[in-house]
């Protein structure tokens, strides 16, 4: 952690400001505006307060990632439907979208996954995606 904070010196200040802002207004938000209330930040119990601080630090990042994967999921589903493909979006695992595709569609399905996942939001730093295929989930990893 110390090496990480030394490499990215502004993160510590950002985290402290995020906690202070959350304590003042009672919530944190994702980049898409989804709010998470954090009454734990005002607890007299140290453990509960520390838990609230962890949630305040993590929610803007992990919550935004959850928002992004949901947007990508909708975009992939629509593309598969609009292109009348047999491929189906069947599962999400954290930041993964799992698509079941006939072999004849595997390459096109992979292209759609990459395009829609990388193109669903525009940030200063582009999102990149790894796409893997296999006969089963284990083989694809």
What is each model feature region?
Residues 1-141:
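Conserved catalytic core of nucleotide polymerization and phosphodiester-bond processing enzymes
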């Amino acid at each position: 952690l110390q090496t990480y904070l030394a490499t990215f010196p502004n993160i510590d200040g950002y985290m402290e400001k995020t906690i202070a802002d959350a304590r003042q207004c009672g919530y944190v938000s994702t980049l898409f505006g989804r709010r998470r209330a954090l009454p734990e930040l005002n607890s007299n119990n140290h453990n509960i307060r520390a838990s609230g601080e962890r949630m305040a630090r993590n929610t803007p990042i992990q919550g935004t990632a959850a928002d992004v994967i949901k947007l990508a999921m909708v975009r992939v589903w629509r593309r598969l439907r609009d292109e009348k493909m047999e491929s189906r979006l069947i599962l999400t695992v954290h930041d993964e979208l799992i698509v079941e595709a006939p072999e004849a569609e595997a390459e096109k399905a992979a292209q759609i996954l990459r395009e829609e996942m990388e193109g669903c939001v525009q940030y200063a730093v582009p999102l990149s995606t790894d796409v893997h295929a296999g006969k089963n989930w284990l083989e694809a990893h």
